[in-house]
Amino acid sequence: MDQSSRYVNLALKEEDLIAGGEHVLCAYIMKPKAGYGYVATAAHFAAESSTGTNVEVCTTDDFTRGVDALVYEVDEARELTKIAYPVALFHRNITDGKAMIASFLTLTMGNNQGMGDVEYAKMHDFYVPEAYRALFDGPSVNISALWKVLGRPEVDGGLVVGTIIKPKLGLRPKPFAEACHAFWLGGDFIKNDEPQGNQPFAPLRDTIALVADAMRRAQDETGEAKLFSANITADDPFEIIARGEYVLETFGENASHVALLVDGYVAGAAAITTARRRFPDNFLHYHRAGHGAVTSPQSKRGYTAFVHCKMARLQGASGIHTGTMGFGKMEGESSDRAIAYMLTQDEAQGPFYRQSWGGMKACTPIISGGMNALRMPGFFENLGNANVILTAGGGAFGHIDGPVAGARSLRQAWQAWRDGVPVLDYAREHKELARAFESFPGDADQIYPGWRKALGVEDTRSALPA
């Protein structure tokens, strides 16, 4: 059934829809299956996303038609479809009238992902008007709270040097806590890796008690505040709360030094909202493990990493992993800095829409995945700032002189970039950074050719056979 007469209105202008403030706008890259027309398929897509079905039904009235989602722009050559969703379509909490990502996704990314006439459709951007945006929680705290704990300025406080304890699984409580202590002697922030939680060989209660003690010892030894991000992910909201309460109680006087990590993609919006509302004074660390199943450029369905991170800010994540923008080991491009800008700025340009956040707190980019001291200056140069949390696992524990030197090398790389000093020049006066070149010679050869001569390091590579 061709529904284009009802669900398509190409006379609508985007600027008028934005000025009206009554529609959520979504941009999809969509391709119909062979034999289906583009506009007719886009209309069916909008119908399935809102008030329609595959046949006319007798219960439809004028009010129903007034809240139809409407296709307002198509560009078949670019496979672009833009749809306007009336804000009234998205349901709200009965307890407080707040909006929810669950409803947003059910409409914009629900049944339309399994339609028989659509070969693929992926959301690349969305726009929320002020009245709807204000119904979301947004972050309660962000990196400014961590800078305050660290004794830094709460604006432009710079890089938080962090790591992930490796191996990601297999450490029992005592060696895990000792690894934390070792890194904290040189670094700021440690996070649970996303699978770490309450394994039989590493009960959460035992591990957290030892980590809290390791933090106290490291702070006493260095005279510096330290930070820990504890994984409280669970299926059951009551389990999330129980874990969070135990963690904060155990850290005691250092409870403000604790972030609470939730695997937001796999555990879902309910887990993020539970943590955001139950623990508003603590940094909510949104890990996105599993997101690549839908956000990867190789996937033509679902939504992009940009969309995922934008939703995280609405939900109230204090920080979310954003990848390394092509400077680490994970998928990414230098242009992914647009994700960081959308998370941190009060008004930012996305792939299709310019979004105003109306004063909503920023969400902090968290950087991980193959980063080390040698890769960091290029990353900062591409981003334009260093106001991020770095969690470098191999970059710290893979340092030739151990995790303390690894942590210091990461900090020194940031300081070199901050001060505008070439990394090799800075390394001549900072041994931990210099030894990072020997720790990661493959990266050093690629990024800093000639580093051995510059640092006076003997070239021990075997000569190639003639």
Curated annotation (Swiss-Prot):
The modification N6-carboxylysine is found at K191. Mg(2+) binds at K191, D193, E194. Keywords: Calvin cycle, Carbon dioxide fixation, Lyase, Magnesium, Metal-binding, Monooxygenase, Oxidoreductase, Photosynthesis. It is an enzyme of class 4 (lyase). One of its GO terms (biological process) is reductive pentose-phosphate cycle. It catalyses: 2 (2R)-3-phosphoglycerate + 2 H(+) = D-ribulose 1,5-bisphosphate + CO2 + H2O; D-ribulose 1,5-bisphosphate + O2 = 2-phosphoglycolate + (2R)-3-phosphoglycerate + 2 H(+). The keyword Hydrolase does not apply. InterPro entries: RuBisCO (IPR033966), RuBisCo_large_chain_AS (IPR020878), RuBisCO_lsu_C (IPR000685), RuBisCO_lsu_C_sf (IPR036376), RuBisCO_lsu_fd_N (IPR017443), RuBisCO_lsu_N_sf (IPR036422), RuBisCO_lsuII (IPR020871). The keyword Oxidoreductase applies. GO terms for molecular function: magnesium ion binding; monooxygenase activity; ribulose-bisphosphate carboxylase activity. Substrate binds at N111, K168, R288, H321, S368. RuBisCO catalyzes two reactions: the carboxylation of D-ribulose 1,5-bisphosphate, the primary event in carbon dioxide fixation, as well as the oxidative fragmentation of the pentose substrate. Both reactions occur simultaneously and in competition at the same active site. The basic functional RuBisCO is composed of a large chain homodimer in a 'head-to-tail' conformation. In contrast to form I RuBisCO, the form II RuBisCO are composed solely of large subunits. This is Ribulose bisphosphate carboxylase. It comes from Rhodospirillum rubrum. The lineage of its organism: Bacteria, Pseudomonadati, Pseudomonadota, Alphaproteobacteria, Rhodospirillales.
